[in-house]
UniProtKB/Swiss-Prot annotation:
DNA-binding region per UniProt: 544-825
Segments traversing the membrane: 1416-1436, 1447-1467, 1473-1493
Protein name: Uncharacterized membrane protein DDB_G0293934
Site (Cleavage): P1239, S1240
Bias (Basic and acidic residues): 822-832, 1617-1634
Entry GO terms, CC: endoplasmic reticulum membrane; nucleus
GO biological process, one term: positive regulation of DNA-templated transcription
Phylogenetic placement of the source organism: Eukaryota, Amoebozoa, Evosea, Eumycetozoa, Dictyostelia
Length: 1713
């Protein structure tokens, strides 16, 4: 089909669609498809009458024909919009009258969308290698349309918008002549001028050719019509594009963008000249572009062949997608000065129109004001009606409609055009993508939306030179750009192929598979709510959903524009497998890819309910020390025991997310179902959003058979076990890999280890990879958790909602290191009997059902067995063994393993009359085989035995454990003991299938082989089993049993034991499964049916089984013993094998084609000896049987017929004693290196009660004695351990059983009668159970501990009380001292105030905190600045306080002078107005501060006065009297001290002597006491002086003092008293602090003894000493040079304030002056 036909079809389809749209909608957007010459009669504008309602005619040119026709049609149509309608010509029909209405509205926008007159332009590159994103560019187009609409409504602009002209994705609005059509915001000229200029232009051809050159050179520039303020010289991002010159950037506020100087002329040549030079020469001026069409293409693609020029030309001008989007917002702000609401709509595209089906169309919808909202709803109805016609793409078309930002009607109609052609592929194009013209036969470049997700997704490094095979390349098969349509042959001549190509080109999951498309479509509904993220304006929103696969388009796509290059990609299945792949052509070695599992995925939404798809992602880093990369396999190789670490880092908007410290709120569409597309296509809401409480990373491993495949049909079934090493003790415990919480955007797992290895690791050819090689890939998934109890302890069942997943490169995991794969098995190192030339074969290991892993054998020739579910085994067989079983032999080592097909080999028991019980075993390839596993055997005279069988199962790590039938008779005892010690085996079921009549003849063995798994899990050390091909050397066994015949005959009881075994097990065949416990349990044997107590007891019962002779039973038992004793060292003899062909044929009919079944029956004949035959001939008399029974009754030791290492007896065992009374009696010491165990499980106990008895009392009542114990017969050696050499007693220490029985009755038992060595007999000997004593001792210890704890608590409490008492005592002392100190300080302050006559209260004595008058000058200086000068003289004061105040005055003076000078110099007229108020304000502030501190001082003094009053009321009642008396006495003394003091002193002494002689009869001490100059202060409480004489003296002295006080008060003046007191008491506070307080501290708290001693000493004082002390104090006080009051005591035992604490007050005993 040629291009004309193509355009014609497109035109017809679009016209029909426009009719439907007009019928269903009131849309303002008209779709015009300019036809070619063959279609000139076709109407261009259809049903434009509906557009009159919205007054907006936007002519969108889609898929326009070649250049010349389009230019003419463009010109004609533009004239029709701006001029009255004329007669329609042949080329273009007349425009309906609604176009005139459009002219009245003065808003005529012609948008050229993806037109063909220009070829596509390659994407420009930024420096980081990332291509420019079409997301913001498309948004720019929408914003520009919106801006133009609003500006047109206001400014009468007619705009011709060229969008995606060069397919670069960057929107451009180009104006005719760059300024003629476009008017500035301030310009309100009519359209006539614009139309006339347009009509007067040199034709549309000249317009286009001249303007397109400029367009080519400025394609990526965001040029906004009507307002060019955005391009103020330089854009915000610098030189945004590769084609923009300086002239364009220098268009500052110029309407004429094409000119270089801002003039309005049509200087297209200058513009293109500079731009082309900048484009071609990296900034230098070059030659202008030619106007010819061919030269346009040549110049356009001149630098395509040299992509490095882009990078070099713009090495500093990286274009940021986000900044471009911001620039567009700036465009909106510049152009829509009066349309702020519409700008808000552009910013919130996802929030304002959630109910509309085309939320991404908000930009254009806003162009048409409120009517566009109605159009949105109608558009969705139109899409539905079209969907009815195209049932194959109903919902997909609707989804396309939702994401068509530019033109809702146009896009939905275009979808319907291609709806039938490509079915579900219609999801991929909302508007058809336009290819270059027909002269370029090259594939189309990726569409604008194919990179729309780069903005919303993190940047990914893309190499420009990546090959199509790269996983990062859109052409890579792994990216699935086209699903089933991965072809890049651009079919310009085929309508369907053209659009189908773009569909497959742009999207990843747009297959013809409805399921895939449904997932994409539903994501479209979710993604369509956020146009900024998806920005799928011209294409379907699937690009937003599949942004991970469409992020990057390397430079290799540039070759798609070449005429020669044609790329064809195929699916991954059709690519031939390369034997050796070039690593650099595939992908990075540790590059984690995006993974899309088959499970449901969810979307995150921000706090504003806008979708966050693409705004975040995460990267994964794996760390491993011993990992290597294989170039041949294109995979990493490591070993299973290797440990590695995986780190996950969130990037983007969730980079700093932490579960416990969430900075923002996000939501997840928890209830949105991606599979129900038919119901959700018309619903654009976000589903039921739930708040995300946390983010978690989860990790699991998948297995793949193809290294290039990352898709798993069911990843749940393809998962591989992985565990994490660690544990509470730091050991290598295998822990479950738990989800990793996101902390600061990070998650981590360390010490990870694979639970199994990959299969088919061996290479078929050394230089070629194994085609069946299995690969492991680690999958990391980011999950959202919406559990409300996330931060609580109830967070047990989190709800994980997967968001994104990453998958690792392929890995090959080997089971062992290469050095460990030797010819000999590791188990040979443990077995001392093994050797390279013989011995036991290596034990096989493996997994799977029905005996998987039971491989191996005896001897040297290796054979292996495997199971249908992955079991395998390696071992060695006997050299001389004749093998009749054709079992698959393979060496399944990890590094040398060939690809094999799963084979099942089954060996079962054959019977003449089988009634099989079938079991189904499923292989990895879902191959099943039905085989009989348990067949009852008929009763025959020859007894046979079918050994217990073990079934192997597969655990989580592909470890082989027994879970199926196998022959225990072919297992050596050492191996079988190892099997029983394996917890994996003991944890599974052991089946016993033994018939009462068939004891040894049949050997039932089931073994399966699987060659797919490697020898990964080395459990062969413990699972040393033999190959079923290996047979027993029966002749050797018969020889050896003849050697033991004599011993066997003496033990005929064994025959009865065998019969008892058969009978007991036959009774238990209905429940043959018993579960054994861990081998670490010392009582494990109790639960084993082979060692059951009932079986042991039945071994020695005298039972005669009818039908079976005694000789037969003996022979059977001998054979059994011989088998078990000789399997370890078999010899080469003839092998007897019987193959039951009938049963073999019966099982072959039931098997699958890949399953083989073989039945083997080994018959062991009995060879009776002569002694046995004689017994048989005699018929076995009853007397013989009775003698045998009597002999076997006292048989000492027996061997377990099933476990050779077990010996037992039913008799009592005595060690160093001949008469044991218990099961084990030991006479002597017991040395135990292990542990002694006793059953103590709660599950076997009942009636459990806590023993609350007084254990301590019981233990305390027990008494320990030293005694001599008499020796007992059979227990004690008569020659040892005696007190003497021949003594019959033994020295011991212990309890007496009788006393113990009274205290602990349950600790004493009766042992029976005991005979002593001295000949006496003790009946009912009492023995003591030491365990009971031990338990009582433990209880007593616990009781003591509880008592000690109580005592400890009591001691702590007492200690706390003692500390409290000490603290309270210290507090009391502190209170007393504080009171006295306050009293002394207050007394001194009161006297100071009186002496100063309250000078402090006067304002002249204004002092800040008592500093003096200098601070007064400082304060007054704020009101009178000259005071600062006066106060500055205090700098010369030697006093520190005054010097500081003087310094402050000086500083204030300097500052004032400087401020005054500056203000006068600069603002002399305002200097006074500023300085004067400032000084006054500062002065008031200083006054307030001074007043505040002064008030504080007054408050403190007031507080002290109040406190002294309280002190007086609380013990200091006479304090004021004492103080006043002291002052009067001191003043009187000072007044008379200077007048003949000695005379008066002598006279007073004489008078006192006379008075004393008269009153006291010879006491000479009254002379000094009666001295008038002596002033004594009365003592209120003279407890320390009990002498009556001294009391009288003190009373007389008090009377004299009172009388003298009255006289002195009348004589003295107040002023003289104040002066004298001030001089004398200036240093009193020092004495109060230094001397009295120290003595008071020493005397406080001393009671009793100190009082009594002080009283005795006081009574011994003589009055002469008292008078002498008073006189000495008086002399010192009268010293004129040292006028001070010395407060001293008359001796060391009488302090100044000797306070004797009383309940009410504190009394001063004496104060001496």
């Amino acid at each position: 089909m040629n291009e004309n036909e193509f355009s014609t079809n497109s035109l017809i389809n679009q016209q029909g669609t426009n009719n439907n749209n007009n019928n269903n909608t009131n849309n303002n957007i008209t779709n015009i498809n300019f036809g070619t010459e063959n279609n000139n009669n076709s109407p261009i504008i259809n049903n434009n009458n509906n557009n009159n309602n919205n007054n907006n005619n936007n002519i969108n040119i889609v898929e326009s024909p070649p250049l010349v026709i389009r230019q003419q049609q463009l010109f004609n149509n533009f004239q029709q919009l701006n001029t009255p309608p004329t007669t329609p010509n042949t080329s273009t029909p007349s425009t309906p009258t609604s176009s005139r209405n459009n002219n009245n509205n003065n808003n005529n926008n012609i948008d050229f969308y993806n037109s063909k007159f220009l070829p596509p332009k390659p994407k420009s590159l930024n420096n980081s290698g990332n291509y420019l994103n079409n997301n913001n560019n498309i948004n720019n187009n929408n914003n520009n349309n919106n801006n133009n609409h609003h500006n047109n409504n206001n400014n009468n602009n007619n705009n011709i918008n060229f969008t995606n002209l060069s397919n670069s994705g960057n929107s451009l609005k180009f104006n005719k002549n760059m300024s003629d059509i476009t008017n500035d915001n301030s310009n309100s000229s009519s359209n006539a001028g614009s139309n006339s200029k347009l009509s007067n232009s040199n034709g549309c051809s000249n317009l286009l050719t001249s303007s397109f050159n400029n367009i080519l050179n400025s394609t990526n520039v965001q040029v906004v019509s009507g307002n060019n303020n955005y391009h103020n010289g330089n854009n915000e991002n610098g030189n945004n594009t590769f084609h923009v010159g300086n002239n364009l950037n220098n268009n500052n506020n110029n309407n004429n963008i094409g000119s270089s100087g801002g003039n309005n002329s049509h200087h297209h040549h200058n513009h293109s000249h500079h731009n082309s030079g900048n484009h071609q020469n990296g900034g230098s001026n070059g030659q202008p572009l030619s106007y010819s069409y061919d030269n346009l293409f040549n110049n356009l693609y001149a630098d395509i062949q040299h992509p490095h020029q882009y990078l070099s030309n713009h090495s500093g001008n990286n274009i940021n997608n986000t900044s471009q989007s911001n620039n567009n917002n700036n465009n909106n702000n510049n152009n829509n000065n009066n349309n702020n609401n519409n700008n808000n709509n552009n910013n919130n595209n996802s929030n304002n129109n959630n109910n509309n089906n085309s939320n991404n169309n908000n930009n254009n919808n806003n162009n048409n004001n409120n009517n566009n909202n109605n159009n949105n709803n109608n558009n969705s109805n139109n899409s539905n009606s079209n969907n009815t016609n195209n049932s194959n793409s109903n919902h997909n078309n609707n989804n396309n409609h939702n994401n068509n930002n530019n033109n809702n009607n146009n896009n939905s109609n275009n979808n319907n055009i291609h709806g039938n052609s490509n079915n579900n592929n219609n999801n991929n194009h909302g508007s058809s993508y336009v290819t270059p013209s027909s002269d370029i036969s090259s594939p189309s470049p990726p569409s604008s939306t194919s990179m729309a997700s780069i903005v919303s997704s993190p940047p990914v490094q893309v190499s420009p030179l990546q090959s199509p095979a790269s996983h990062l390349s859109p052409m890579s098969p792994s990216n699935n750009f086209g699903g089933n349509h991965n072809n890049y042959n651009h079919a310009h001549h085929s309508h369907h192929n053209n659009h189908a190509h773009h569909n497959t080109h742009n999207y990843n999951n747009n297959n013809n598979n409805n399921n895939n498309n449904n997932n994409n479509n539903n994501n479209n509904n979710n993604n369509s709510n956020n146009s900024n993220n998806n920005s799928n304006t011209n294409n379907n929103g699937n690009n937003g959903n599949n942004s991970n696969n469409n992020n990057n388009h390397p430079m290799s796509h540039i070759d798609a524009f070449n005429k020669v290059t044609q790329l064809t990609s195929t699916t991954s299945t059709s690519i031939p497998k390369k034997l050796k792949r070039d690593y650099e052509q595939t992908f990075s070695k540790d590059e984690w890819e995006d993974y899309t599992p088959p499970s449901k995925y969810f979307q995150l939404f921000s706090y504003s309910k806008s979708e966050m798809s693409g705004s975040f992602s995460f990267k994964v880093k794996r760390t491993d020390k011993n990992i290597q990369y294989s170039e041949l396999d294109s995979a990493w190789i490591l070993y299973r025991q290797n440990r590695f670490q995986v780190d996950c880092d969130l990037i983007g908007s969730l980079e700093s997310w932490s579960n416990l410290d969430r900075n923002n709120t996000i939501f997840v569409n928890s209830n949105n179902n991606n599979n129900n597309n038919n119901n959700n296509n018309n619903n654009n809401d976000n589903g039921d959003l739930s708040e995300v409480n946390g983010l978690f990373f989860t990790l699991y491993v998948l297995k793949f058979t193809d290294a290039n495949n990352i898709q798993s049909s069911n990843d749940q079934n393809d998962r591989v076990p992985i565990h994490q090493l660690g544990g509470a003790t730091g050991k290598k415990d295998r822990l479950t890999v738990e989800p990793s919480p996101v902390v600061k955007g990070r998650g981590c797992w360390n010490k990870l280890q694979f639970g199994s290895a990959t299969s088919n690791n061996a290479r078929v050819h050394p230089d070629q990879p194994n085609p069946n090689q299995q690969f492991f890939r680690v999958v990391i998934t980011l999950n959202a958790v919406i559990d409300k109890n996330f931060e609580n302890q109830n967070f047990t069942t989190p709800q994980f909602y997967p968001i994104q997943s990453k998958i690792s490169p392929p890995m090959i995991v080997r089971g062992q290191n290469p050095g460990r794969f030797l010819n000999h098995d590791k188990s040979l190192k443990k077995d001392p009997n093994s050797s390279p030339n013989g011995g036991k074969g290596g034990g096989g290991s493996g997994s799977g059902g029905m005996g998987g892993g039971m491989g191996g054998g005896m001897g040297n020739n290796g054979s292996s067995g495997s199971s249908s579910n992955g079991g395998y085994g390696n071992g060695s067989a006997n050299k001389h063994m004749k093998t009749f079983l054709n079992t698959s032999n393979s060496d399944n080592s990890d590094d040398d393993q060939s690809p094999t097909t799963t084979t099942t080999t089954t060996t079962t028991t054959t019977t003449p009359t089988p009634t099989p019980t079938t079991t189904t075993t499923t292989t990895n390839e879902t191959t099943t085989s039905t085989i009989p596993t348990t067949t009852p055997l008929p009763k025959t005279p020859s007894p046979t035995l079918t050994a217990p069988s073990i079934t192997t199962t597969l655990d989580g790590n592909n470890t082989s454990i027994f879970n199926g039938p196998c022959d225990l008779t072919t297992i050596d005892p050492l191996t079988f003991s190892n099997l029983l010690q394996d917890p994996l085996i003991l944890g599974q079921t052991m089946m016993v299938d033994i018939d009462s009549n068939n004891i040894l003849n049949n050997i039932n063995t089931n073994s399966t082989i699987n060659n797919n798994n490697n020898n990964n899990n080395t459990n062969s050390d413990d699972l040393m089993v033999y190959d079923p091909q290996t047979t027993l050397d029966l002749a050797n066994l018969i020889q050896q049993q003849q050697l033991h015949q004599q011993q066997q005959l003496s033990n005929l009881k064994a025959a009865q034991a065998a019969a008892a075994i058969a009978a007991s097990i036959a009774n238990t065949t209905s429940t043959p499964n018993t579960t054994s416990t861990d081998i670490q349990n010392p009582f494990n044997f109790l639960n084993n049916p082979l060692t059951n107590t009932n079986i042991q007891q039945s071994l020695f019962l005298n039972q005669n089984i009818p039908g079976v002779s005694t000789n037969q039973m003996i022979n059977s038992l001998n054979l059994a013993n011989g088998l078990l004793q000789n399997t370890t060292t078999p010899q080469s003899h003839h092998t007897i094998l019987e193959i039951n062909n009938n049963h073999h044929h019966h099982q072959q009919q039931q098997q699958q084609p890949i399953t083989t079944t073989t039945t083997t029956t080994t018959t062991i004949p009995s060879t009776p000896q002569p002694s046995q035959q004689s017994m048989t001939n005699s018929g076995g008399s009853s007397s013989t049987n009775s003698s045998i029974s009597r002999k076997n009754k006292f048989a000492k030791w027996n061997t377990n017929p099933f476990m050779e290492e077990v010996i037992y007896t039913n008799n009592k065992v005595g060690i160093n004693t001949t008469t044991p009374t218990q099961a084990l009696a030991v006479n002597g010491n017991i040395l135990v290196t292990g542990e002694l165990f006793k059953p103590s499980d709660q599950r076997i106990k009942s009636n459990i009660r806590l023993d609350n008895t007084d254990h301590w009392d019981k233990i305390n009542r027990l008494k320990i004695y030293d005694y001599d114990r008499k020796k007992m017969m059979g227990y004690d050696d008569p020659n040892n351990n005696g007190t003497t050499q021949e003594s019959t007693t033994v020295k011991e220490k212990g309890f007496l059983a009788q006393e113990v029985k009274e205290v602990l009755p349950n600790a004493v038992k009766v042992a029976g009668e005991v005979k002593l060595q001295d000949g006496t007999t003790v009946p009912n000997l009492l023995v003591v159970n030491d365990r009971v004593l031990l338990l009582e001792n433990i209880g007593a210890t616990q009781q003591i501990g509880r008592s000690l704890k109580k005592e400890k608590d009591h001691i702590v409490k007492i200690d706390r009380d003692l500390d409290r008492v000490k603290i309270e005592g210290s507090r009391e002392k502190h209170v007393i001292l504080t009171r006295m100190q306050d009293m002394v300080n207050f007394m001194h302050s009161e006297e100071s105030e009186r002496s100063n006559n309250n000078n402090e209260e006067s304002c002249v004595y204004c002092s800040l905190m008592g500093f003096g008058p200098a601070w007064t000058m400082f304060v007054f200086g704020f009101f009178i600045p000259i005071c600062w000068i006066i106060g500055s003289f205090y700098l010369f004061s030697p006093t520190r306080v005054k010097w500081v105040s003087g310094l402050m005055n000086f500083v204030a003076t300097i500052i004032f002078i400087l401020a005054l000078s500056l203000m006068t110099f600069y603002v002399p007229e305002l200097a006074a107005l500023i300085i004067a108020p400032a000084l006054i304000v500062m002065g008031f502030v200083v006054c307030i501060l001074v007043g505040f501190f002064r008030q504080r001082n007054r408050e403190k003094k007031r507080y002290l006065r109040e406190r002294i009053k309280l002190m007086q009321a609380d013990g200091y009642k006479n304090l004021a009297d004492h103080v006043s008396s002291f002052r009067v006495d001191y003043n009187q003394h000072q007044a008379k001290a200077n007048n003949n003091m000695l005379k008066k002193k002598k006279k007073r002494i004489q008078m006192e002597k006379l008075n004393s002689q008269r009153n006291y009869g010879g006491i000479n001490t009254t002379d000094k006491i009666n001295n008038s100059n002596i002033n004594n202060i009365g003592i209120n409480n003279p407890n320390n002086i009990q002498n009556n004489q001294i009391n009288n003296i003190l009373n007389n002295s008090n009377n004299n003092i009172n009388n003298n006080n009255q006289e002195r008060l009348s004589d003295s003046s107040k002023s003289s008293f104040i002066d004298d007191f001030k001089k004398s008491s200036s240093n009193n506070h020092k004495d109060f602090h230094e001397i009295p307080l120290q003595e008071i501290i020493q005397s406080i708290g001393i009671k009793g003894k100190k009082q009594s001693s002080s009283s005795a000493k006081t009574r011994s004082l003589s009055s002469s000493n008292l008078v002498n002390s008073v006189n000495s104090n008086l002399v010192n006080s009268t010293n004129s040079n040292n006028t001070s009051i010395l407060l001293k005591s008359h001796n060391s035992n009488s302090p100044l304030f000797n306070s004797t604490p009383t309940p009410t007050n504190v009394v001063f005993n004496s104060i001496e002056v």
